[in-house]
């Protein structure tokens, strides 16, 4: 049986937690158009990492077979 391919775009965006049971992602809306956003929004709310929702976790794991 051939090796499973990893989706490279997903590999750059997601990584497992230390235990490997959950998946971490970066929050959106912090790349550009930041002038009108408040400091609180940029630093406190958007800087933290977030967990992938349970409903999406299965799809992410299918894209990353060796995670």
UniProtKB/Swiss-Prot annotation:
The keyword Chloroplast does not apply. GO terms for molecular function: structural constituent of ribosome. InterPro entries: Ribosomal_bL35, Ribosomal_bL35-like, Ribosomal_bL35_CS, Ribosomal_bL35_sf. Keywords: Ribonucleoprotein, Ribosomal protein. Pfam families: Ribosomal_L35p. One of its GO terms (cellular component) is cytosolic large ribosomal subunit. GO terms for biological process: translation. PROSITE patterns: RIBOSOMAL_L35. SUPFAM superfamilies: L35p-like. Belongs to the bacterial ribosomal protein bL35 family. This is Large ribosomal subunit protein bL35. It comes from Synechocystis sp. (strain ATCC 27184 / PCC 6803 / Kazusa). The lineage of its organism: Bacteria, Bacillati, Cyanobacteriota, Cyanophyceae, Synechococcales.
